[in-house]
Regions:
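Active-site loop-to-helix "anion-binding N-cap" substructures in soluble metabolic enzymes
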Residues: 1-167
Length: 167
């Protein structure tokens, strides 16, 4: 994995050779739901430029996000990202495979887009555990931080994953 900085400047995705790379993109899909339906897709639409760039470069894309404030380490259906995966699939006209259990690994097909279950269901997210951070870092070639609203949090998916990347 690469965390790319040049002269104290963060490099944009468009400046990298992304061709056929595995991208782990931390996005903000903490969208409002009403009766299981997305009531505002503003945050989903905000990830489209990064998705488009990844698709154009034949990347395999792994999306991670949180939704709400579930009890860490416990599944709670009301905070599941499954409806979001279905929504993105319709929006971009390309399947976004939803993966509920990913911590022990999963197969990723070249060019595929996957959305992992709510990262806050994972033990160690809020505590920035080294174990979870390493698991996330091991998923990809390049980590992309595209969740501005969560960037200030010192969590495994926003901070720790970067510590375990190559510089």
């Amino acid at each position: 994995m690469k965390c790319v900085h040049q002269n104290d400047r963060i490099v944009k995705m468009s400046e990298l050779n992304l061709t056929k790379k595995k991208l782990l993109i931390r996005v903000d899909l903490n969208v409002p739901l009403s009766e299981g339906k997305i009531s505002s897709d503003k945050r989903i639409r905000a990830i489209l430029p990064a998705l488009k760039l990844g698709i154009e470069n034949k990347c395999s894309i792994i999306l991670i996000s949180h939704m709400g404030r579930p009890k860490e380490g416990q599944f709670d259906k009301q905070y599941s990202l499954k409806p979001v995966a279905e929504y993105i699939t319709q929006l971009i006209q390309k399947e976004v495979r939803f993966i509920s259990e990913w911590a022990d690994g999963f197969d990723l097909i070249e060019g595929e887009i996957v959305l992992l279950e709510n990262i806050r269901f994972s033990e160690g997210e809020k505590d920035n555990s080294d174990n979870l951070s390493k698991k996330l870092a091991d998923l990809c070639d390049i980590f992309v931080m595209d969740a501005f609203g969560s960037a200030h949090r010192k969590h495994a998916s926003t901070y720790g994953v970067i510590e375990f990347s190559e510089t």
